[in-house]
Amino acid sequence: MVLIRVLANLLILQLSYAQKSSELVTGGHPCNINEHPFLVLVYHDGYQCGGTLINEEWVLTAAHCDGKKMKLQFGLHSKNEPNKDKQTRVPKEKFFCLSSKNFIKWGKDIMLIRLNRPVNNSTHIAPLSLPSSPPSQNTVCNIMGWGTISPTKEIYPDVPHCANINILDHAVCRAFYPGLLEKSKTLCAGILQGGKDICQGDSGGPLICNGQVQGIVSVGGNPCAEPRVPAIYTKVFDHLDWIKSIIAGNTAATCPL
C-alpha cells in the first residue's frame, strides 16, 4: 500500500544550514548552475522546501511548507559554496487557499509568499513564467530540488538535482491516492517504470513544462520513484486568477472551487 507522505523533510541546521535537509530529486542528475535562477530554498524550524520565484517580490510554494521564522534563499546552487549573488528574504505576507494545517484537500496545497523586499535579478536570480495554458498528457517536464537523491536513504546533495518526467493520465494517480477526485486541480506526473521522482525535501518546488511553472510539488509515494506510483502536483494554471488577483492587491480573492 502506498503511503502518502508530506514531502517536506527535517532540515538539520549547521553553520548557515545543513546539507541533510530537503527532499531531493531521486534518479536525476546535478542541475547546471545556470539552469535554475528561479529556484528558491525555503526553510524554517528544521524543515526545508523548494519554491519558485514568479516575480521580484513573489514566490510560489506548497501550503504545507508554511512555518514560523521562515527564510528564503535566492540564487543558491551549492550549499557549501554559495554564489556571490545569493540573496536572503523573509515573508512579508502569506496567502493560502486553505489553512496550511488543512492542505490535504487535493489541489489546495498552494501558498503565495510576498517578500519583505524585492530581490534583485542577477546572473543566478530570475523569475519563471506562469503558465499560458495547461500541459497536455505526455508532456515532458522538469523537476528539481535539494531533496534526497535516494528513494530509501537520506542522501542529500550539495547542489540541486534535476530530472525529466511526464505528465500522466489522472487515472494513474487516482489508482494510488484515495480521495483524489477526477477533476481535482492537480497534475499527475512521473515515470511509469519508476526510477525518477521527487522525494523528501522537494515539497513546494516547481514542475516546469515548456519553460513555465505548471505544478507545485505536493505529495508522492513512499518510497520514492516506485514503478506506477507518480506524484501529485498542485496545478498552477487552475489558480492563475487567484494568483494574479492577490499580486494585484485584491487580498480577499477566493481560490477556485
UniProtKB/Swiss-Prot annotation:
The active site is at H64 (charge relay system), D109 (charge relay system), S203 (charge relay system). Residues 25-248 form the Peptidase S1 domain. Glycans are attached at N120, N121. It is found in: Secreted. SMART domains: Tryp_SPc (SM00020). Residues 19-24 form a propeptide. CDD domains: Tryp_SPc. GO terms for molecular function: serine-type endopeptidase activity; toxin activity. The keyword Nucleus does not apply. Snake venom serine protease that may act in the hemostasis system of the prey. This is Snake venom serine protease KN11. It comes from Trimeresurus stejnegeri (Chinese green tree viper).
